[in-house]
Amino acid sequence: MLSTGALRAHLLAAGLAGTVATPREESLRSYRLFAARDPRVLLGLDPTGGWGEADLLRLMADKCGVSDDPAHRSGLDVIDPERTLRGLDAFAARVGAAAARRVPVLLGTGHPHRLLGFYVALADALSAAGCLVLTPAQGRCVDITTRFGVRTYVVDYVRGVALVREPGPSGDGREPGAHSHSPLPVRAALESAAEAGGPLPELVIGDHGWVCGAGQLGIEAIGLADTDDPALFVGEAEGQVSVAVPVDDGVRPAFYRPLTRYVLNRACLSR
């Protein structure tokens, strides 16, 4: 069993919390774009509050532990490991409750290069506990606006975890998929599930648009978020997102394995 102290030490050593790799300038830019209601950073959320830049900086200081000083505009951002641990505990409680009730779940990631293994382990554990891990809209095309213009992607699943790929053959199946912030894939998945007569997920687990897109539609959603992803924390503050865990979402995949073990243990799903 991984102790809280051991996980805290790992979070700091791996750069998952403490001083993280996200530049302060990038976080502040995201807050500025969110305040302007730029859909690229809303991630499918339709916030009800005003949420100006100063409001967002205060919120992110409270939720993540970043500096609340608006004059601090350069360097690397900081995540308080205690907030990460509290978030993981709340995240694990939701996963455990879903497993206990054996509800249908949907898992999806916009960070397949880094986080796919984390979600695959959760999908395996939830399936073993009797949850139906949904895979709707597999093979469906979704047009997503990127910085390069509108690109067509395909919804795909790897061991129960949704992601998007560029069209074409996926080779031997080891291709990790594309990075995406868009809520369109989760909307496509939910629409496909509804068209097929259900069931719909009672819990969505993921990041980026998978969480905010589902939460905005009234489905319980939990996920991981970096300091430049204010939408998940706004969603948590407003009630559309159940749990947003502050953590660097861009470190090596192996560094998330202790988080997986911790969550599964706390959720009573360790095998």
Residue ranges and their predicted role:
Residues 1-101, 105-110:
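Metallocofactor- and cofactor-centric catalytic cores in central/energy metabolism, strongly enriched
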Residues 91-95, 186-193, 259:
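Generic hydrophobic alpha-helical segments
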Residues 99, 127, 215:
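Anion (oxyanion) recognition and catalysis
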Residues 103, 131-132, 219:
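Short phosphate-binding/catalytic loops that engage adenosine nucleotides
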Residues 108-120, 207-212, 228-229:
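Gly/Ser/Thr-rich loops at beta-strand to alpha-helix junctions
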Residues 118-185:
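Long, charge-dense
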Residues 182, 186-227:
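A cross-taxonomic marker for long C-terminal extensions/tails that follow the last structured domain
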Residues 199, 214-271:
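C-terminal functional extensions of proteins
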